[in-house]
């Protein structure tokens, strides 16, 4: 399936846009924490112009649904909804944590990734993912927001070496050093739309899209317990 998907993400300090067309990705990104509203629409125009497409030519519009900065997540979904509504496109929300796992695979071939984004207030947004042979990512832990010291206390021992991604690892290096499994740094700090668009294609192929009015953010602030998902090794 040769899908044409535009992805937008402003959930963290990184502002990014990516366009998937003919299985090729055209992307723009810039770490600009306070300029997302200024940067994102020009990026959209650039990638569409480079591909010779308009919004009406696309099959879907994807967005980083969170977790991340409350303001950043709201900006991204608001802009994505506006574009999708005008072009009558279905939408696909993609986890920013899962996108960082995909980035670790893209850059380093990592297949077991532990993602921790600095959530401020002495907490991290946390999840672990394992990549399957079909390219899909399976969550090992339920996405949550949790104090890193508590995470280190509650996490179960594991024989795998987990590739780390996210700003939480440097922000809470001492606390997370207590985790009962080995880690290797991927140097992936932020989610990026070029990875969101790949995960969005998987969802599109499964028919997992929603209309504009049903697209929603994921903040995680009400999900504060670490939980290993059932049946996941």
From Swiss-Prot:
Q: Superkingdom of the source?
A: Bacteria
One GO BP on record is: tRNA threonylcarbamoyladenosine modification
Gene Ontology CC terms, in alphabetical order: cytosol
User: What are the UniProt keywords, alphabetically?
Assistant: Cytoplasm, tRNA processing
InterPro entries cross-referenced by the UniProt entry: ATPase_NBD, Gcp-like_dom, T6A_TsaB
Q: Name one Pfam family in it.
A: TsaD
The family this protein is said to belong to? Belongs to the KAE1 / TsaD family. TsaB subfamily.
- Additional comment: Structural analysis identified two distinctly different modes of TsaB dimer formation. In one form, prevalent in the absence of nucleotide, the putative nucleotide-binding site is incomplete and lacks a binding pocket for a nucleotide base. In the second form, an interface between the two subunits apparently completes a nucleotide-binding site. This analysis suggests that the two dimer architectures observed in the crystal structures correspond to a free and a nucleotide-bound form of TsaB.
Self-association and partners? Homodimer.
Q: What does this protein do?
A: Required for the formation of a threonylcarbamoyl group on adenosine at position 37 (t(6)A37) in tRNAs that read codons beginning with adenine. Is involved in the transfer of the threonylcarbamoyl moiety of threonylcarbamoyl-AMP (TC-AMP) to the N6 group of A37, together with TsaD and TsaE; this reaction does not require ATP in vitro. TsaB seems to play an indirect role in the t(6)A biosynthesis pathway, possibly in regulating the core enzymatic function of TsaD.
Which protein, by its recorded name, is this?
Answer: tRNA threonylcarbamoyladenosine biosynthesis protein TsaB
What is the species of this protein? Vibrio parahaemolyticus serotype O3:K6 (strain RIMD 2210633)
The major lineage groups are: Bacteria, Pseudomonadati, Pseudomonadota, Gammaproteobacteria, Vibrionales
């Amino acid at each position: 399936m040769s899908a044409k998907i535009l992805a937008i993400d402003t959930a963290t300090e990184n502002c990014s846009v990516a366009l998937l067309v003919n299985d090729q990705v055209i992307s723009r990104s810039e770490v600009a924490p306070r300029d997302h509203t200024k940067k994102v629409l020009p990026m959209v125009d650039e990638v569409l112009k480079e591909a010779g497409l308009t919004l009406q030519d696309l099959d879907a519009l994807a967005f980083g649904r969170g977790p991340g900065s409350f303001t950043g997540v709201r900006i991204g979904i608001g802009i994505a909804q506006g574009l999708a509504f005008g072009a009558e496109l279905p939408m696909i929300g993609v986890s920013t944590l899962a996108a960082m796992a995909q980035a670790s695979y893209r850059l380093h071939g990592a297949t077991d990734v532990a993602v921790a984004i600095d959530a401020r207030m002495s907490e991290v947004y946390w999840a672990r993912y394992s990549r399957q042979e079909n390219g899909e990512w399976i969550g090992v832990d339920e996405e949550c927001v949790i104090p890193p010291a508590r995470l280190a206390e509650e996490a179960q021992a594991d024989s795998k070496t987990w590739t780390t991604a996210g700003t939480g690892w440097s922000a809470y290096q001492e606390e997370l050093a207590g985790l009962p499994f080995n880690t290797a740094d991927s140097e992936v700090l932020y989610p990026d739309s070029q990875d969101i668009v790949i995960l969005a294609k998987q969802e599109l192929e499964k028919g997992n899209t929603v209309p504009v009015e049903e697209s929603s953010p994921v903040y995680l602030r009400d999900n504060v317990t670490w939980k290993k998902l059932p049946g996941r090794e």
